[in-house]
């Protein structure tokens, strides 16, 4: 049975482990070599997943434990981005980075063959999706690129293969992250506002007319419940990534597409019945963030929010109940961030590093660094 680290001992344990593991690349087995048998692990063991680019240029999804050890890999046909986790924690869906057209269904604990989902003609994925409350459906944000509108593709996963059974509109352009509300009745979508087309894969076609928004949709019907739009003078603040705190309040990270001389607030909150509110970051920190928030997550009890700023080499922390900024830690190119427990986080970076961080109070501990590996933008708790 895997050794568990009690929270009180975790930092001391990881400090010792880091002295051994940092700089050591672990050759993890692929799932083809055998599943991660649940019976071999403590049922309370935490697992994590992230997309990565390997030293040989190929792409994969890696399964990790809570001390940063790589347990398994699943190959991807191209670069991955976000990962959705089913309510029972048995199924992962890895999404291609925009403008990719694949999603991969992975069941890491039973060793079954991964199953490929391909976007329908005229669509591509935006890198994110989520499950319905019962795990039967998957909602994937998509680009209807000839029309220039955001779509949520609805996929039934109950059969032998995923079947696309319908779609909802996102009432915006460039949908990015999608969440299921804590009551499982509402879909929350961050419409980034940026028009793109796969013929010009990374070109942004409408920066002068961007209209980002956060929308709340009825998960059963797709009906629009609420749409929060950002103030006109900040219309180039693309709203991208989200999480929910303990109260269900939505926290959003933005990426500013306007002049580099401007440094608007990059973190916002809202609720179904509460308008968007932007939150100030100290000027001495804001000036170095390069107007970019990469990932947004909450700790296990939803009392602390972490927002990564990889271009500025910072992770920023917020107290959820007061919505106040409480501190920052430096991790060069640190972007993927996921909670381990009530106070600590596992963070990945673009230089192959995996770090442990005690919210805003402790210096990061580098657990491992795989030379030539580049972790993608998101770390997801399974």
Where are these regions (language model features)?
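N-terminal secretory signal peptides and thylakoid transit peptides that target proteins
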Residues: 2-20
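A short beta-strand motif characteristic of beta-propeller blades
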Residues: 69-74, 114-119, 163-168, 225-231, ...
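Asp-box/WD-like beta-propeller blade repeats and closely related beta-sheet repeat scaffolds
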Residues: 120-128, 141-181
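Short, conserved, GDST-rich strand-edge loop motifs in beta-rich repeat architectures
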Residues: 141-144, 189-209, 253-264
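Beta-propeller blade signature
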Residues: 152-157, 208-219, 265-272
């Amino acid at each position: 049975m895997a050794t568990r680290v009690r929270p009180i001992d975790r930092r001391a344990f990881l400090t010792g482990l880091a002295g051994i593991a940092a700089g050591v690349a672990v050759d993890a087995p692929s799932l083809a070599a055998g599943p991660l048998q649940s019976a071999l692990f403590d049922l309370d063991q935490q697992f994590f997943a992230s997309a990565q680019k390997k030293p040989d240029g190929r792409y994969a999804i890696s399964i990790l434990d809570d001390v940063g050890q790589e347990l398994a890999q699943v190959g991807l046909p191209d670069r991955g981005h976000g990962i959705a986790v089913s309510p029972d924690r048995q199924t992962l869906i890895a999404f291609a980075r925009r403008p990719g057209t694949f999603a991969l269904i992975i069941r890491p604990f039973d060793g079954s063959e991964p199953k490929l989902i391909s976007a329908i003609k005229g669509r591509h994925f935006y890198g994110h999706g989520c499950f319905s409350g019962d795990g039967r459906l998957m909602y994937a944000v998509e680009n209807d690129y000839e029309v220039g509108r955001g779509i949520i593709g609805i996929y039934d996963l109950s059969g032998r293969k995923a079947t696309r059974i319908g779609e909802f509109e996102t009432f915006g352009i460039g949908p990015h992250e999608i969440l299921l509300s804590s009551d499982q009745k509402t879909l929350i979508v961050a419409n980034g506002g940026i028009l793109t087309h796969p013929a010009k894969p990374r070109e942004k076609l409408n920066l002068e007319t961007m209209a980002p928004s956060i929308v709340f949709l009825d998960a059963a019907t797709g009906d629009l419940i609420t749409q929060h739009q950002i103030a006109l003078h900040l219309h180039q603040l693309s709203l991208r990534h989200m999480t929910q705190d303990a109260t269900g309040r939505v926290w959003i990270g933005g990426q500013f597409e306007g002049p580099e001389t401007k440094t608007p607030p990059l973190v916002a909150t809202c609720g179904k019945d509460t308008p968007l509110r932007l939150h100030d970051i100290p000027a001495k920190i804001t000036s170095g963030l390069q107007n970019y928030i990469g990932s947004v997550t909450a700790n296990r009890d939803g009392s602390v929010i972490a927002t990564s700023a990889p271009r500025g080499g910072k992770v920023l922390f917020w107290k959820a109940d007061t919505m106040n900024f409480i501190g920052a830690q430096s991790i060069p190119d640190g972007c993927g961030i996921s909670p381990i427990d009530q106070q600590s986080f596992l963070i990945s970076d673009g230089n192959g590093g995996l770090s442990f961080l005690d919210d805003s109070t402790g210096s990061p501990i580098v657990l491992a660094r795989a030379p030539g590996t580049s972790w993608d933008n998101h770390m997801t708790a399974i």
